[in-house]
Amino acid sequence: MFSLGFCLSVAVPALAETILLTGATVHTVSGPTLAPGQVLIKDGKIVAVDKVIRTKADKVVKLDGRHLYPGLIAASTSLGLVEINAVRATRDASEVGEYTPDVESWVAVNPDSELIPVARANGITHFLPVPSGGIVAGQSGLMVADGWTIEDMTIKKAVALHIFWPGMELDTTPKEEFKDKSKWKSLEDQAKERREKIKALEDFFEEARAYAKAREAGGKNGLPSENVVPAWEAMLPYARSELPVMVHADNERQIKTAVQWAATNSFKIIVAGARDAWKVAGLLATNQVPVIFERIYNQASALSSTPARDTHRYDVYFTAPETLHQAGVKVILSEGLDGQAAATLRNLPYSAAQAVAFGLPEDEALKSITLYPAQVLGVADRLGSIEAGKEATLFAADGDILDLRSHVKRMWIAGREVNLENRHTRLYEKYRARPRAK
């Protein structure tokens, strides 16, 4: 009887109710900020956004003094795939092999991760878990930061294919100064190895295109049907330029080569990591390549807080988003994949705040973690801004979300209010209630 009752409670949806959020400063992102404004929600969708909405609602939520924002989107992260970086058993971000396009990151996400509620408590409602390892690492799907299972959490499968572009820098260290002399390579050997890796990647995509043509022609005009190969099947939408390829590249030469490769083959690409993207901002703008900049805090590499080169100013990566924006590049901010990035994803609003402090307009900074990732990931029809017709995924904070002192007080995902409790708040309450020494 208990099991039957439980199943029935899950199968029968809750009665739809109309909710009116009133009194808050509404940051629509796609339009003007309403101070104060009102948002009407019905069946999980935003029905109306205005200064005054004259209609009756089943429930009125007063948010006087609060700031209402659309849910933040982390466009490149290891959240859900990595729990404790020092514990191998909790790291499931990479697969064995150099070319694994059929890997699907969303099936590996741990819905019970303690890090997901922590990120959610600071306004992050959606995230893109990125597979890593090898050259073609696999595909990512967009997840919502709330749900019992991966099926609950996956809102869009196969968002992008991830390529970790081969290294393009040459090591000029003399052999006599090289630590492990057995691994030392001459400049000629390094250049040859680099060319071979790029050629292998180009050949891989050529084979994918050939497979796509064979699949289209199979069974027609007396031609035999092509045998289905999972890896090549996964490549079909990318070989046909239907879905974007996310190229993870930091070095200037890597980014240049990747953009030229994409332009030559008419591929849609997104550059992620993008440490040196500011150096080639014009090239990126000309080719309309969006950038996911991950180096505000993790600058040269994992957990590094200094620029990659001694000749760079201390603020080179703080000003990079503004440099890209001025050139006409669509800039998205994220915390990336390095080191403790999954645990520090909660700091996403503060990366945007740092960019504002060094020149990026505040409205652009807010778009870089809301509307722009929604557009690039193909979900702008339902996420990324507060406007009629979109999903009612938003949160109320007690101040500017780009201000370190602000706190998220309430959150709704698809019109349903979610719990903001997490491991951090539980520990806070636990130790706050500790008996004091007399």
Can you describe what each PLM-predicted range is?
Residues 84-85, 90-94, 99-103, 244, ...:
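His/Asp/Glu-enriched, well-ordered alpha-helical/loop segment
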Residues 24-27, 387-431:
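C-terminal cap of metal-dependent C-N hydrolases
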Residues 26, 30-69, 88:
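Histidine-rich, glycine-flanked metal-binding segment
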Residues 1-13:
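Bacterial N-terminal signal peptides
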Residues 14-18:
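Boundary at the C-terminal end of the N-terminal hydrophobic targeting segment
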Residues 115, 120-270, 407:
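Polyanionic/metal-chelating signatures
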